[in-house]
C-alpha cells in the first residue's frame, strides 16, 4: 500500500509505524501525536491541533493552531487536510485507547467519513487494524481474528467468503453484532458489501490484498 499516502499520528496509544513513510507521503502530527513523532524520529510535514493534550504549540515550521471549541476533532481536521491535498489512503496511528474513549469512537467514525469520500482509512492498534468500506470489497490474507460490523443503518449484499462464519448476499444492521468473533478459515478471505458501509477489524498479522 506504499505510495502517496497520508499518515496521521494522534495522541492515543502508539505502538510504532508498520511502514516507513516515503517522500511521496504526507505525515500529520495531531496535537500530542507530535511527541510520538519526536521520540520515534518521525518528521511530520504538518503539526496541527488545539494543543490541549500537548500543552502548547511546538516549534515546527508548519503549525496549524486550531481553536479548542470546534466541530472537527484534530483527527478529522487532519483527514480533511489530507483529502484536500489529494490523498486517498490514510494510515492513522495513536487513534485508539489513551485517556479518552470518546475519541476512540470518534476515530472509528472517521473511517466511515473517509469511506464516504471514496477513500480508505486504516486505524492501527497494538494487535489489530480497523478499516471501513462502502459499496465495495476487500480481500484478506493471513491467519487470525476478523470482525465485521454494519456501522451505518442497514448494509445489504454482505458476502463473507473464506471466514469461519460465512454470509452470502445477506442484510445486516447496526443494532446487532452478527459479525463479531469471526476468523480466517482459508488462505484468502473476501468481505463485500453492495449497498452500505461496513466497519472491519482484523488481526495485525493479516494483510489486505490489492
Model-derived features: where do they sit?
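General beta-strand structural signal in soluble alpha/beta enzymes
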Residues: 9, 28-30, 49, 64, ...
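Structural motif
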Residues: 9-13, 95-96, 202-204
Amino acid at each position: 500500500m506504499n505510495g502517496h499516502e497520508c499518515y496521521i499520528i494522534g495522541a492515543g496509544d502508539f505502538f510504532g509505524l508498520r511502514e516507513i513513510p516515503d517522500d511521496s507521503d504526507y505525515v500529520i502530527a495531531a496535537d500530542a501525536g507530535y511527541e510520538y513523532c519526536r521520540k520515534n524520529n518521525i518528521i511530520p510535514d504538518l503539526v496541527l491541533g488545539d494543543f490541549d493534550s500537548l500543552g502548547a504549540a511546538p516549534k515546527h515550521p508548519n503549525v496549524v493552531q486550531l481553536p479548542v471549541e470546534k466541530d472537527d476533532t484534530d483527527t478529522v481536521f487532519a483527514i480533511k487536510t489530507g483529502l484536500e491535498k489529494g490523498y486517498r489512503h490514510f494510515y492513522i496511528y495513536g487513534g485508539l485507547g489513551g485517556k479518552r474513549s470518546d475519541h476512540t469512537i470518534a476515530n472509528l467514525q472517521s473511517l466511515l467519513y473517509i469511506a464516504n469520500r471514496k477513500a480508505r482509512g486504516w486505524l492501527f492498534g497494538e494487535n489489530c487494524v480497523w478499516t471501513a468500506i462502502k459499496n465495495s470489497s476487500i480481500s484478506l490474507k493471513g491467519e487470525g481474528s476478523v470482525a465485521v460490523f454494519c456501522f451505518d443503518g442497514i448494509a445489504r449484499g454482505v458476502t463473507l467468503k473464506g471466514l469461519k462464519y460465512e454470509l452470502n448476499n445477506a442484510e445486516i444492521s447496526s443494532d446487532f453484532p452478527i459479525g463479531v468473533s469471526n476468523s480466517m478459515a482459508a488462505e484468502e478471505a473476501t468481505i463485500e458489501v453492495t449497498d452500505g458501509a461496513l466497519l472491519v477489524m482484523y488481526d495485525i498479522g493479516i494483510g489486505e490484498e490489492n
